[in-house]
Amino acid sequence: MFALVDGNNFYATCETVFRPALAGRPLVVLSNNDGCAVARSEAAKALGIKMGAPWFQIARLVESDGLIGLSANFPLYGDMSNRMMSLAAGLGPTQEIYSIDESFIGLDGVRGVLGERAQKIRWLFYTTEADDEMKCFD
């Protein structure tokens, strides 16, 4: 059995860890040369912004809906990915990193109730309280 650890809206979420004022706001992270949206916050998705939307087509939402467009910060995302994968590695005996924000954790031989393990994973990687930011990165 395997667990999948997957960062939600990973690039956008990384930006909010160090800039908490962005949490809950419509936010897109833009590709190299700020050409198109490569990551979207939930609030940006609610505006109907599609993955890969060209910036010139959605820039009008800056004034009308408070959209924030940020240039990609790949060193930040790499650092946050390394932190996340280090935490994930301790959740089971094997780990297969699939992408910058996805990892499969082997659960063979893991003792205890898997539901409790799932709750531990959620606690490590997720909080909805802006004051806590991400408990796992202190």
List the predicted regions and their residue ranges.
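Gly/Gly-Pro- and Ser/Thr-rich, intrinsically disordered tail segments characteristic of DNA damage-repair
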Residues: 1-128
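Single conserved hydrophobic/aromatic residue that forms the stacking wall/gate
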Residues: 123-126, 133-138
